[in-house]
Design a protein with these regions (language model features):
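C-terminal regulatory/effector modules of DNA-binding transcriptional regulators
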Residues: 1-2, 35
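Amphipathic alpha-helical segments enriched in hydrophobic/aromatic residues interleaved with Lys/Arg
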Residues: 103-137
Length: 137
């Protein structure tokens, strides 16, 4: 695992497992500029408030919920409170999700935030131990 060596902000990367990447990060203020991913970004805010622009609206992720950012959707990120924010994120190729769904259509989470208990439990299991290799989906 690598850990960014900065005074306050850091990013921890879990060992790569095929088409899945996992990170845990902390940002005290500005997190990242607007960008896109080719993958689904599925995660959870662990502490603080994670604020981000997504689909032309300002969003705020709190501990206990689930973030699902769809491929090729522009988003940014910053702390929504003075304490900063810590989160874990899983980046998954769309084909892998479709395979896990048995070919059913890919899911869509409007607005990027979900309080669905099934999704929260599933993402928590995948994000739990950053130093543990993932099991196949």
């Amino acid at each position: 695992m690598s850990h960014a060596n900065t005074p306050r902000d850091w990013v921890l990367r879990a060992p790569q497992h095929g088409a899945v990447e996992r990170i845990e990060a902390y940002f005290a203020g500005h997190g990242y500029d607007p960008h896109r991913h080719d993958t689904y970004a599925i995660g959870q805010t662990l502490a603080g408030v994670q604020s981000f622009r997504y689909r032309r609206s300002q969003r705020h992720s709190l501990p206990g919920g689930c973030l699902v950012l769809h491929p090729d959707e522009l988003h940014d990120g910053e702390a929504g409170s003075q304490e900063g924010f810590r989160y874990r994120m899983l980046y998954v190729e769309p084909a892998l999700i479709q395979q896990a769904l048995g070919g059913r259509p890919l899911p869509f989470v409007r607005g990027g935030l979900s309080d669905d208990p099934r999704l929260i439990a599933a993402s928590r299991a995948l994000l739990q131990a950053m130093d543990t290799p993932l099991e196949p989906l």
